[in-house]
């Protein structure tokens, strides 16, 4: 019948899309270059198509009562609204957006850093923070292509994890904060005992260590 042929065509399209996504992800993950979610971004539109297709079927599926049907639409609208609000709350630091399952922008750095979070985009904001708080000297371990001395001048002392524990003001990019943990001799694990004074753009952690 016509409906059966249509159904088979839809199933084939969705299976083909799913196979493409799996193939692309396998190639990306097993490749030598794996430095960010951007490598699998081309698959996102296809994933959205699959999700929308299943969502459409779920909404159109005959419900036992009209209340159940209305409940489905209400749930979808609520989740979409929640997603929009959640995205807007991180403004203007959209690169640092993580959903609530990952801990939001405050906790996402625990899972992924580098180009997923940190492009060195907050160096200018660090400059404003230093000026606003009248900080004369601050040690900076910055991940990015910007020039720390250009923005902070003599206030900045270039710093690295292998310098060991220190006191005073310290700014560390999230990427270095996390990746240093792979090296016991050059790790920022000692900072776990201190709370950051500020997370600038969620990509630069600023500490004021008294002792």
Model-identified regions with their sequence ranges:
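Signature aromatic-anchored transmembrane alpha helix within multi-pass, membrane-resident enzymes
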Residues: 3, 17-22, 54-92
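Transmembrane alpha-helix segments characteristic
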Residues: 3, 7-29, 189-194
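Membrane-interfacial loop-to-transmembrane-helix junctions in polytopic alpha-helical membrane proteins
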Residues: 6-13, 32, 36, 68-71
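Aromatic-acidic/polar surface patches that form glycan- and anion
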Residues: 12-15, 35, 112-119
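Generic recognition of stable, solvent-exposed alpha-helical segments in well-folded globular domains
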Residues: 17, 21, 37-41, 46, ...
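Hydrophobic/aromatic-rich transmembrane helices and adjacent perimembrane loops
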Residues: 26-27, 34-56, 207
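Transmembrane alpha-helical segments
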Residues: 30, 54, 76-117
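C-terminal luminal/periplasmic domains and tails of membrane-associated envelope-modifying transferases
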Residues: 102-211
């Amino acid at each position: 019948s016509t409906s059966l042929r249509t159904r088979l065509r839809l199933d084939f399209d969705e299976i083909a899309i799913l196979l493409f996504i799996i193939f692309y992800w396998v190639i990306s993950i097993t490749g030598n270059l794996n430095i960010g979610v951007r490598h699998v971004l081309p698959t996102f539109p296809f994933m959205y198509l699959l999700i929308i297709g299943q969502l459409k079927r779920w909404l159109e599926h005959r419900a036992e009562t009209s209340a159940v049907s209305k409940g489905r639409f209400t749930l979808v609208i609520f989740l979409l609204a929640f997603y929009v609000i959640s995205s807007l709350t991180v403004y203007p630091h959209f690169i640092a957006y993580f959903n609530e399952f990952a801990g939001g922008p405050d906790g996402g750095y625990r899972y992924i850093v580098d180009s997923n979070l940190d492009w060195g985009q907050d160096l200018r904001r660090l400059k404003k923070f230093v000026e606003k708080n009248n900080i004369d000297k601050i040690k900076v371990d910055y991940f990015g292509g910007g020039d720390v001395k250009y923005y902070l001048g003599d206030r900045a002392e270039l710093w690295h994890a292998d310098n060991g524990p220190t006191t005073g003001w310290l700014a560390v990019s999230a990427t270095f904060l996390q990746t240093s943990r792979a090296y016991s001799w050059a790790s920022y694990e000692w900072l776990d005992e201190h709370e950051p004074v500020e997370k600038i753009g969620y990509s630069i952690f600023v500490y004021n260590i008294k002792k």
